[in-house]
From Swiss-Prot:
Predominant cellular place of this UniProt entry's protein: cytoplasm
GO cellular component, one term: cytoplasm
Enzyme kind, highest EC tier: transferase
Pfam families to which the protein is assigned, alphabetical: TAL_FSA (PF00923)
Active-site residue numbers: K127
Name this polypeptide is given: Transaldolase
UniProt keyword annotations, A-Z: Cytoplasm, Pentose shunt, Schiff base, Transferase
Organism expressing this protein natively: Helicobacter pylori (strain ATCC 700392 / 26695) (Campylobacter pylori)
Biological-process GO terms, alphabetical: carbohydrate metabolic process; pentose-phosphate shunt
InterPro entries: Aldolase_TIM, TAL/FSA, Transaldolase_2, Transaldolase_AS
Length: 316
């Protein structure tokens, strides 16, 4: 399916040197993403960083982090570069800016430009959260011809606004990362069984429509947070349900491996807007508004990434 791409939402030194290469070589994935939580998990729990951390002792915590993270990003970039050279729409790895700069547009822009210049790779995307100041950062980076991954997108309204900016200004590849499963984790305990495990897909589909309404050929919807939060769902539930044209799904390894055992042979047809509106009306019967939920989840996501980054820095 040329219209649909699968990326890997995982980064860790041993993985990059082994299974990551296997996934690329067999055509299973054509890109990857990272975030502060993934780096925290990898660096604090994997033995493959210990020697390098020991050699960096005495340096500032953020300097240690950047030394380790940028090495991983460069390694992923090199592995993906043949895909990028074949098709500049594929072969990207994403690196997120310091979560603690989230509410300071000027400092975020400076850091993003510094990181992109340091890495000096055309297939690196800078990840920017979809906060109020983050949208300003996205505009500045796209004008500077830096590929961007706009992350923590929960609201269709915000997705549309970002797509409009990218449609006017994007000169390089861009993706809008729509988070999915966190909606179901939030809403499912509040609704009857017949409405469960649907809110994330419904909301993501509405975001997809908003993005496609405005986006240019350089911009795609990237479905993120596609690992299941419930044991009752198939591990690849969100990949299969959101296998749409001109979209990407970045998935954790468990979901990715499950999907590869029985992949879709063709793209899914998204729900109609009338079906989306009907579902939202049903949610309102239970006093649930998806836009309000989106705002809550964005705030929680920003806090979670800060907490992960702080935990990682304090580990040094």
């Amino acid at each position: 399916m040329q219209e649909f791409s699968l990326w890997c939402d995982f980064i860790e030194r041993d993985f990059l040197e082994n299974d990551f290469l296997k996934l690329i070589n067999k055509g299973a994935i054509c890109g990857a993403t990272s975030n502060p939580s993934l780096f925290c998990e990898a660096i604090t729990k994997s033995a493959f960083y210990k020697d390098e951390i020991a050699k960096l002792k005495g340096k500032k915590a953020k300097e240690i982090y950047e030394t380790l993270a940028l090495k991983d990003i460069l390694q992923a970039s090199s592995a993906l570069m043949p895909l990028y050279e074949k098709d500049p729409n594929n072969g990207y790895i994403s690196l997120e800016i310091d979560p603690f700069l989230e509410d300071d547009a000027a400092k975020s822009i400076d850091e993003a430009k510094r990181l992109f210049k340091t890495l000096n790779r055309p297939n690196v995307m800078i990840k920017v959260p979809a906060s109020e100041s983050g949208i300003e950062v996205v505009s500045a980076l796209t004008q500077a011809s830096i590929p961007v991954n706009v992350t923590l997108v929960f609201s269709p309204k915000i997705a549309g606004e970002i797509a409009q900016i990218l449609a006017k200004e994007a000169q390089k590849r861009a993706v809008i990362s729509v988070f999915v499963s966190r909606f179901d984790k939030e809403i499912d305990p509040l609704v009857p069984k017949n409405l469960q495990a649907q809110s994330g897909i419904i909301n993501a589909t509405e975001c997809y429509y908003q993005i496609n309404q405005h986006a240019n050929k350089l911009t795609s919807t990237l479905f993120a947070s596609t690992g299941v939060k419930s044991n009752s769902l198939a591990k690849d539930y969100y990949i299969k349900a959101l296998c749409f044209k001109n979209s990407i799904n970045t998935a954790p390894l468990e979901a990715l491996n499950a999907y590869l055992l029985d992949p879709n042979t063709e793209c899914q047809t998204p729900l109609k807007t009338t079906e989306i509106e009907a579902f939202k009306k049903e949610l309102k019967v239970h006093n649930i508004d998806l836009e309000n939920t989106a705002q809550k989840l964005l705030k929680e996501g920003l806090i979670a990434f800060k907490q992960s980054f702080e935990k990682l820095l304090s580990s040094f």
